């Protein structure tokens, strides 16, 4: 039962390379900084093995990109590379690109599972 335990902490408990690499969500790192564990959580490996990976993303990251376009006048908005004028407001168009990129990554991972 892994409820309440982070995948990273579960991997950090493993101290032997073969056991770490056998785990569905962990990978062994030969060179680490002093005080760091060799066995670490690997989200790419976890996704490939079909393990559900919870995304730890803070809302602050998306707010920062949205705010850079907020409140700009139409002319200024249209000149900015990641902004677009929509209706009566200036909006961040990079969020849409990020969502499309995330969707294509998920689609590619799913297709890889089928073959």
Curated annotation (Swiss-Prot):
Swiss-Prot/TrEMBL keywords: Cell membrane, Glycoprotein, GPI-anchor, Lipoprotein, Membrane, Trypanosomiasis
Species of origin: Trypanosoma brucei brucei
Glycosylation positions in this chain: 42
Residue span(s) of the pro-peptide: 93-115
A matching Pfam family: Trypan_glycop_C
Superkingdom, natural source: Eukaryota
Lipid bilayer topology: Lipid-anchor; GPI-anchor
Localization per Swiss-Prot or TrEMBL: Cell membrane
GPI-anchor amidated aspartate: lipidated positions: 92
Functional summary from the UniProt entry: VSG forms a coat on the surface of the parasite. The trypanosome evades the immune response of the host by expressing a series of antigenically distinct VSGs from an estimated 1000 VSG genes.
Coiled coil: none
One GO CC term, this protein: plasma membrane
InterPro entries for the chain: Variant_surf_glycoprt_trypan_C
Organism lineage: Eukaryota, Discoba, Euglenozoa, Kinetoplastea, Metakinetoplastina
Protein's UniProt name: Variant surface glycoprotein ANTAT 1.8
């Amino acid at each position: 039962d892994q409820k309440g335990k982070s995948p990273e902490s579960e991997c950090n408990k493993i101290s032997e390379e073969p056991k770490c690499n056998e785990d569905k969500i962990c990978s062994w790192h030969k060179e680490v900084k002093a005080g760091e564990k060799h066995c670490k959580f690997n989200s790419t490996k976890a996704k490939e093995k079909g393990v559900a990976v919870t995304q730890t993303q803070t809302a602050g990251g998306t707010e920062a990109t949205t705010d850079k376009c907020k409140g700009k006048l139409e002319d200024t908005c249209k000149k900015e590379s990641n902004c677009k004028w929509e209706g009566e407001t200036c909006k961040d168009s990079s969020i849409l690109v990020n969502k499309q990129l995330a969707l294509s990554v998920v689609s590619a991972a799913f297709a890889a599972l089928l073959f």
